[in-house]
C-alpha cells in the first residue's frame, strides 16, 4: 500500500523550533552587551531572600555600607608665603583641649580626641578596660556608653563620661556623681531617631544584672526620653543633672546628624556645656540595616551647620562642639576640626586598634563568621572572633 503523506508541522515562533534556538543564542551573545540589572542587583536580591526567611528587617553592626561624601573629598592647602608653617621638630603645636570651660571642673584633654560611649554589653570587659587604660595613657577620656558603669573602667579612666539614656538601663545617680562629665544620649548618627539595641546573645547574667533585665533577651531602648517632650523640658533636665553633680562637671547632649542647624540651635539654647554631633558614618553595635543606610547626613555637611548654629545663638566659646562619625586617622580629625569642631570622639577606629577585623592566629573569620577578616559586620551576634564585641569567655580570651 502506498504510504500516506504527512504534513510537516510549522514551527510556532514562540514555542520550540528555531525560534528557541535563536533566543538561546541571542541570550548568550548579548549577555555582556545588555549589562547587569542596576536596580535588583545580586546583593539586593540576596537581601530580599534573607528578609523573606527572617520575616523582619536585618540587624547588623559596624559602619555605613554605602558611598557618601567623606573627608577624603577634602584636602588641605598648606602654608607657603601667605602663612608660615610650624617647624614640627622644634616648635610646639598646642593640642590641649578643654570641654565645658564654664564648669568648675572642666574636662581637660591633652589631645582633641577621646573614646566615645560604647557599652559594656556591646563590648567585652577586656575591650572596655583596655580602652580606658589607653585613653589615660594618651591624656584623654572615655565614656561608659549605655547600660551603666563597670568599676574597673572608672578606675582605669582618668577622665570619664557617664551616659544617661532613654531607657535608664543601669543608670545609677551615685555612679553619675563619680563622673567627670555627664552625656545625655538623644540620638546617634547611624540610626537617628531610634533607641539602642543589644541582642539577647550578649545579655549575659552580668549584663542583665547591671541593666535590671532578664538574661538572654533582646534589649531595645525607647526612642524618646521619658523626662521631656520638648526643648523646655530638656533645659530642665540639664539643670537637674547639674544639681545632681553639684554644678561641677560638664553636661553634654549627644545628637545624631539630621536637621542639624535647628537641632543644634535648640540644644544650645538648653545651655549644656557641650554638644556631641554624630554623623551618619558613625558605627553601631547593633541596628537595622535599612535605617543605617537611609537616615542621617554626612559629617562634612553636618559640622558646618552645627558650628553655625552655636555661633548664631551666641554660644561660641561657651558650648564645646564635639564631632564623631567615620574618623579613621589624624587627617580626618584635622579636617573635622578645620570645619568647626572643637574636639573629636572615636569609636570604630579604637576598636580596630584592639584587633577588630584583624586576621589573628586564634580566629578563623570565614569559618566562624562566614566573611573574610576586614569584611566583618557581625558585632550584634556576640560571636566576635577577636574578643572585642562579645561576652563569650572563650572569645574574650583572644583579646590579650
What spans do the regions from the language model cover?
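Active-site-proximal loop/turn and secondary-structure-junction residues that shape catalytic pockets
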Residues: 119, 148-150, 166-168, 186-190, ...
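Hydrophobic faces of well-ordered beta-strands that scaffold small-molecule active sites
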Residues: 113-116, 140-144, 158-164, 180-184, ...
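Glycine-rich phosphate/ribose-binding loops and adjacent secondary-structure elements
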Residues: 225-396
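Conserved, well-structured core domains of diverse proteins
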Residues: 1-113, 117, 122-136, 140-141, ...
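Hydrophobic, small-residue-rich alpha-helical packing segments that form membrane-like cores
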Residues: 170, 192-220, 224, 229-235, ...
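Mobile "lid/hinge" segments at catalytic clefts and subdomain interfaces of large enzymes
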Residues: 178, 183-185, 189-213, 377-400
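Conserved radical SAM core fold
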Residues: 122, 189-192, 214-221, 225, ...
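Flexible hinge/switch segments at interdomain interfaces of large molecular machines
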Residues: 105-109, 207-214, 278
